[in-house]
Amino acid sequence: MDPQKPYKKELKRNSRKRSLNMSQNSERIRIIERDITELKVDAIVNAANNTLLGGGGVDGAIHRAAGPGLLEECRTLNGCPTGEAKITKGYLLPAKYVIHTVGPIWQEGTKGEDEFLASCYRKSLELARKYDVKTIAFPTISTGAYGFPSERAARIAVSQVKEFLKVNELPEIVFLVCYNKEACKNIKKALEENL
């Protein structure tokens, strides 16, 4: 399955960074309810833990689908702090790269969780730009076992992606991948509110 096929469009490449109007910006964001491990995009984002050695949820699914090469490469990275991101090859995944980011554990909003989550999106997008990633897929970071409220996380995700796309040509398309209808509803609402 190639989710980007119907959405491919050529962007004028005047420079690596340029100002994009809001309608172009919004057209570059797609909301889909799919298995992120099956997407044929340049990079998928892994909602990882600090060790980067696999875990539950999307992290475990990505490690299983990518095969043992991913774990071997992750062992060489020496973990990742919360709010940061690191990149590896995709191995057996359809995606060329996996960008691993460590979201915050929700603690009632008292430990800077919003900024850590925002940083996850920014740092992942910065790595994507650095590696010339044209299409990237994000899961809903920190909303599973880490307990971040889904609506709040959706608003942060949408605002960070839109802010980045305003001034960057790459990635061309950002997929926000929902694991259920509730997550999709929250992301759609956040996107509508952030027009």
UniProtKB/Swiss-Prot annotation:
Residues 1-23 are annotated as: Disordered. Residues 16-195 form the Macro domain. GO terms for molecular function: deacetylase activity. Residues 1-13 have a biased composition (Basic and acidic residues). SMART domains: A1pp (SM00506). CDD domains: Macro_OAADPr_deacetylase. Belongs to the MacroD-type family. This is Macro domain-containing protein MA_1614. It comes from Methanosarcina acetivorans (strain ATCC 35395 / DSM 2834 / JCM 12185 / C2A).
